[in-house]
């Protein structure tokens, strides 16, 4: 088996074929996949046949799995390492990067499509990805100098409040206090600077709250222009891997009366962005 890559967008994202992720891949193949993620930031593996065990086994080849979130409801899936991205969470419709609200944020996410809804007037349930490396590169130099030293506070409660959801238990609130992350970070794999934004970012530390919120809004608007965005149209059997350290993503609307079953695993970064090289 050899990895075959076909670029899907002028600046990032690639279809990846020639490998069966349900098998015990040699380390050379895993290294090829890691290098492709560093280059393209988003990889789409079509026509995979994965169950939860094989998806989890492959994810572990790419890094330590992030700890499960505090969750008070009943879980549908057997393995707590999975996030159930099905008909459940409107918060995923906002631009975000996975687990930026954790002290040690997410690194790579792997989302597998077991079942997808039919196209509908409400939408097809695509996922959009924004390349935050290219978005940073396109900023004026004066703006780069302004934002270089800035730190934003991230909280899952802030992003959920934007869609009117505030019903967290005391245990969930205690388990997920606000955290601080760099607004501009350097990717540890390839050394390129990238914006680090999310709907979880509530304000800029040591700035007046209105000024910081407006800056965050302006940067998200800049980073999500069409020239920086790839749209993934799902098919059953697609596994998509994306690098949260240099992308944002969001889910699009779909007919929520239809079954939809997508399951995500996210690996954990090495440290808080504040503890990584600037």
Where are these regions (language model features)?
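Non-heme Fe(II) oxygenase catalytic core, chiefly the N-lobe of the double-stranded beta-helix
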Residues: 2-239, 245-278
């Amino acid at each position: 088996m050899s990895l075959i890559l076909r670029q899907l967008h002028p600046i990032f994202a690639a279809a990846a074929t020639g490998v069966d992720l349900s098998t015990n891949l040699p380390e050379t193949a895993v290294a090829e996949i890691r290098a492709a993620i560093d280059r393209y930031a988003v990889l789409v593996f079509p026509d995979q046949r994965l169950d939860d065990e094989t998806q989890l086994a492959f994810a572990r080849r790419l890094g330590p799995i992030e700890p499960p979130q505090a969750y008070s409801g009943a879980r549908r899936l057997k393995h707590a390492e999975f996030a159930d991205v099905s008909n459940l969470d409107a918060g995923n419709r906002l631009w975000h990067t996975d687990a930026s609200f954790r002290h040690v944020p997410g690194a790579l996410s792997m989302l597998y499509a077991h079942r997808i809804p039919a196209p509908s007037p409400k939408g097809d349930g695509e996922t959009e990805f924004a390349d935050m490396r290219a978005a940073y590169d396109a900023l004026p130099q004066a703006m780069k100098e302004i934002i270089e030293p800035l730190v934003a506070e991230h909280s899952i409660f802030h992003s959920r409040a934007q869609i009117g959801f505030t019903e967290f238990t005391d245990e969930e609130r205690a388990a997920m206090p606000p955290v601080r992350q760099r607004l501009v970070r350097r990717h540890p794999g390839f050394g390129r600077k990238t914006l680090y934004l999310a709907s979880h970012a509530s304000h800029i530390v040591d700035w007046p709250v209105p000024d910081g919120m407006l800056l965050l809004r302006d940067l998200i608007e800049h980073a999500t222009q069409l020239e920086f965005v790839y749209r993934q149209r799902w098919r059953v059997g697609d596994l998509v891997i994306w690098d949260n350290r240099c992308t944002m993503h969001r889910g699009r609307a779909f007919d929520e009366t239809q079954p939809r079953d997508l399951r995500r695993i996210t690996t954990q970064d090495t440290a808080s962005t504040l503890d990584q090289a600037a």
